[in-house]
């Protein structure tokens, strides 16, 4: 949900903070730039030039989701989750902290949602350039906010 991560999002044009309008159908920057929240729950944060790439198409996303649902990468995602848990323990992160975990190229949110399941209170930002991926990303976990953006541009 974007409401859970709005405090860490910024306008890609000028870096000012974003806030949601009353019904959270738009995110608006302090400087007045507005970004529509898609009905599926993600927001596209692109600068004046828009996005250079469209990312994976629906068939690619569907194939990836089918593959991942069979558990082929389960050992890997478990190792990533354990590593992040251990890292937070090593740095002494308080139990009541709400760390933000960001995954760039998050796709459908498979990895991010598993990590959030293992870190109580953590919030997730999933970023992908594909709107098809963002539709699944937006609903992969209640503490994930989905953003369509090109991380190589501001």
Language-model segment annotations:
Residues 137-138:
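Conserved SAM-binding loop
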Residues 96-107:
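Conserved class I S-adenosyl-L-methionine
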Residues 122-125:
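Short beta-strand element of Class I
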Residues 128-132:
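Conserved SAM/SAH-binding beta-strand->alpha-helix loop
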Residues 53-79, 83, 87:
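Class I SAM-dependent methyltransferase Rossmann-like catalytic core
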Residues 1-55:
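N-terminal auxiliary segments of SAM/dcSAM-dependent transferases
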Residues 108-120:
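Conserved SAM-binding loop of SAM-dependent methyltransferases across substrates and taxa
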Residues 142-153:
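Conserved SAM-binding strand-loop segment of SAM-dependent methyltransferases
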């Amino acid at each position: 949900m974007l409401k859970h991560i709005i405090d860490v999002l910024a306008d890609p044009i000028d870096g000012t903070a974003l806030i949601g309008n009353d019904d959270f159908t738009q995110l608006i920057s302090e400087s007045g730039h507005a970004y529509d929240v898609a009905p599926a729950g993600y927001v596209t944060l692109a600068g004046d030039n828009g996005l250079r790439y469209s990312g994976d198409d629906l068939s690619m996303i569907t194939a990836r989701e089918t593959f991942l649902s069979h558990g082929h990468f389960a050992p890997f995602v478990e190792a990533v989750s354990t590593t992040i848990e251990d890292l937070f323990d090593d740095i002494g992160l308080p139990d009541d902290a709400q760390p933000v975990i960001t995954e760039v190229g998050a796709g459908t949110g498979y990895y991010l949602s598993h990590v959030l399941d293992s870190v109580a209170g953590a919030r997730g930002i999933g970023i992908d350039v594909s709107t098809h991926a963002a539709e699944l990303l937006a609903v992969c976990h209640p503490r994930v906010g989905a953003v369509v953006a090109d991380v190589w541009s501001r």
